[in-house]
Amino acid sequence: MSPRVRLIVAVTLFGCLSSPIWSRQISFEHILGANKEPENWLTYSATTFSQRHSLLSQITAANVKNLELQWIYQARSLEKFEATSLVVDGVLYAVQPPNDVIALDAATGRIFWTYSYHPEHARPCCGRVNRGLAILGDTLFMGTLDSQLIAIDAKDGHPIWQTTVAKARSAYVITHAPLIIKDKVLVGVAGGEFGIRGFIGAYDSRTGRQVWRFNTVPGPGEPGHETWGGDSWQTGGAPVWVTGSYDPALNLTYWGTGNPSPDWNSDARPGDNLYSDSVIALDADTGKLKWYYQFTPHDDFDFDSVQVPVLADIEWQGKPLKVMLWANRNGFFYVLDRTTGQFLLGKPFVKVTWASGFDERGKPVRVAGQTPSLDGTLVYPGNPGGTSWYSPSYSPRTGLFYIPAWVNSSSMFVKLPGPYHEGRDYSGGTARSFVPFNWSPAPNFRKEEEGYGAVLALDPQTGERKWEFKMADVTEAGILTTASDLLFSGGREGYFFALDARNGELLWKVALGAAVQSGPLTYSVKGRQYVAVNAGNCLFTFALRQ
């Protein structure tokens, strides 16, 4: 951001210094104990276990029909509004595209302050989006589309420090919400369609100094380097663009990684291409790899495994076990031992044709002929996958895992050889889907035989589908469950709805006039529970009729 823009922002913000919106410091212990204060939403996925399950219960199956719109915030951008807001003691912190932070009264929508940042040389693949913030003490943290990490005073919006994470001209971008662990701010870099070399970095929350870095594409001398042919590791991708999770008992942080580069011309990168399309478990203090599991070795399909790692403590074969639940873009649902990374279960939750199952080590068994070709190859699931970055939820009350899914959707995968050029597209082909993306100008000509969107409820013990809520269109909305056994979600068709989490019964819905492309959140102010969600370029907030 230029000095002139900095001056304009500073003058604007100093005029708002008198806004009395702050009462206490948010310590890391507060974040770890987020379930003890469900009136707030302190991290991207509600807790470091990323279950997106709230203990609030004022809104129930009996009264959810009485939800009424309380206020709307309209963003000053027409880009996709994908961020999950934070809520701290009655103040809601939102990010509007591309990188503007807004502090609002969570009960009324009144704006306290706005911090505007204009990313320079940003080259995102898929929209100028941001998915949220992190908070520690009285400081907010935001990653930007030009790969900056910025610390912002939560009281008045004044920038505190700014550090460069990666080179924006090479198409490194940050789109996800940072994750706070102890006194560190963790972020990863996106840019897998441009041949970046992915990594996750930890930064000192006070200064912005890098503390450690883990390369998701290992270089010479690093374990896993042998899974890359020639010099392909230098442009290997494996981006990180969705927020990870953390288990304090194990001191492990878990992150999903994206596709290897180029996406569809895998001839350019022989080998399994570690650690692309994997979950990696890192020591939170040092960044050292403890274990990994690769969902799609030598990915041909752009099946990013950046889904949120959902942590749960369940009974497994009669014994208590720390597990990780994962619905992958590749169409399979997984259960892993999160202490060791051991593969416990893999089962398709949508139609899958690229793999027939798993070997004894948990590695997928590829189906012959199911690879991109010059003429195009039809594969299920399609390029959008069975699911993607939109957040699932796990309810300890029902014991079910809930997925926003693209059911029975396919693509024609085409590979096109081509050279790498810094900062330019390096996809190596294309994927033709029968369902237009929601940012496409093409009309939506979806037919039922081409797939549909749904909320799926899975039994983690078996991977079996317990119920399905079918939508008229596909979905890019996350899921929220609550202690009153409600499930909130939405879809591209423009509805926001509440289901009975036990059986999928529709209890309430409202038309918002635009696609829901974020995860709902819930919070309370002065004893009143609210539910908020983004649709189009607006933030809608609901509460029970008074």
Segment roles from a protein language model:
Residues 50-168, 482:
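N-terminal cofactor/phosphate-binding cores enriched in small/glycine residues
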Residues 26-69, 216-223, 363-368, 444-445, ...:
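Blade/loop signatures of beta-propeller domains
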Residues 198-209, 272-287, 340-341, 453-460:
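Beta-propeller blade signature
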Residues 38-39, 89-90, 137-138, 182-184, ...:
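Short coil/turn segments that connect the beta-strands within blades of beta-propeller domains
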Residues 105-108, 153-156, 205-207, 284-286, ...:
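Short loop/turn segments that connect beta-strands within beta-propeller blades
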Residues 518-546:
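Blade-level signature of beta-propeller repeat domains, shared across WD40, Kelch, NHL, RCC1
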Residues 73-84, 114-134, 162-177, 194, ...:
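Extracytoplasmic beta-rich repeat domains
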